[in-house]
């Protein structure tokens, strides 16, 4: 039976650890079974993240390339963490080394290699990207920055506008499946947590890179770590591109400019830890035909700010972790770029305030956890919402915000964990009430279990449920060929999952099955009807009930461990996912999201060490998407399957790294989203410095 443990800072020692700069992220990442993803370890996840933090030993590049097997590595936590052998639900973790090895310029590009993630890109370098999990859409997942929810209640399209450059990310964690008792509303199909770097020594780093289509990116980061428990870090970056498309008039309509700045600090002593951050993201980009195929000169400007503070006690039997945050999102959409006289610009401002309190304690029957969260979402807009009693001025214009909406979400969680020698069980309930929803407080249960067979095999199974409130866009957007329904009901999901994992001596294999049952699923649909301006009319609706059956499998080889006598082959991996959607009588409707899912996805990668510190990696992905889209001639088109090859070559020295990357190496023609063709071959070269 689970026994109470002293709440001192504890250290777990893994006896065997391969010091490689890459791990299993589906094919690119590392599959980590995280201790039943309990409230005690996950609710209001901190910058330590979903996974157990690994303190990486310092090694030079020679040792790294030889794949030295270190005999003991400390894994330190601020609570008594569950060991690897006790863990149950799957979380995919991409480390900093994995990020550096991949041929990508944005987090969105990186997630394309996660087999369970669907990345539908509408522009270069993540200008506008919809990221979803297991056949869902961008509205159905929660995005977190250092454990703080940064989802945009206006629309999921802008959820990846966070204030840190990809070079400043320590790791990315992907949780697949409903997570109501972990992250609350919006985590209908999972969550993605982005954890930033916190170097323990004073340091300075910078990078610059350039490439195809006028691409340029540069950034700098400075960190001051004092000996009296304080750590402060400041970073900034700028990225631009001319884009790869032109409108009918020959002007740029996929260009991109973004600036980011981020400050984070922390204080830690023997009794407590406090962390805080503040950041901003400014982005201007040509929106091409992103929102309507009829108009090819759309433009969007977004400005976001993020502030948060978190704390936790490090001693005592009763463990408490509170946090408070405020995110502001400002958005200006131009149906005709720079021509407000043709159609007035759409202005929106969303302020999101949140307070979380998570607590747990250990006793003779296990670990009991409870949590509470209050989240307020306030929108003022020019065209989204109900009429305001007192209009608010739009800064820098002669117009006012005349409509808006305010809603509050309250969540309570109760959970208990039982840990035996080979068996782990976690069960809990989440109670949710939203001021906008015309329904009483709803309760969503969840249970996770795992059974360990020896040291290498593990069986696991889970049942979880969750819900999602409609976004403000789904409720009120009626512009440019769209007609929203303000009476949309929340969508709900219940899901079963079962799987097996094998991990031993350089070989990792995983297979899983899942069943997702959607109720009142929200989507935009069209029957081909045109609006008064001749654009295809899309309506937001509760689509009804849809069932998904899916399977995922991956096989990864650490070739340094399997073939220690050679140095050329570093790693090889393959992964595959399959989704079957129960046939729905769509009565001739075309769906924007619900029926446009990835039925088949295959990813693989091979990493080589050519000579000394010269590495070369190849990455391949194949995607087969279901569904149709209406082209610019109002004709119905089916999505075509495609395969893309990417590559990266790098030379890593002690204080600098030089690299060249090629995306879509063979120039495949494809679309992730109807009427928005993706770029052909894209080449980037750069250098980074670390002092």
Question: Where are the predicted features?
Answer:
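Short acidic/polar hinge/loop motifs at secondary-structure boundaries
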Residues: 149-176
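A beta-strand signature from Gram-negative outer-membrane beta-barrel systems
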Residues: 166-203, 557-558, 563
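N-terminal periplasmic "start-of-domain" segments of outer-membrane beta-barrel proteins
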Residues: 69-100, 130
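Outer-membrane beta-barrel signature, preferentially recognizing the C-terminal barrel domain
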Residues: 292-314, 348-350, 405, 438, ...
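Flexible loop and strand-edge segments within Gram-negative outer membrane beta-barrel domains
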Residues: 53, 241-248, 252-258, 272-320, ...
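Short strand-turn segments of transmembrane beta-barrel domains in outer membranes
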Residues: 191, 196-225, 236, 251-255
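Extracytoplasmic beta-strand/coil segments of soluble accessory domains associated
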Residues: 108, 112-148, 152
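Gram-negative outer-membrane beta-barrel transporters
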Residues: 419-424, 515-517, 539-627, 688
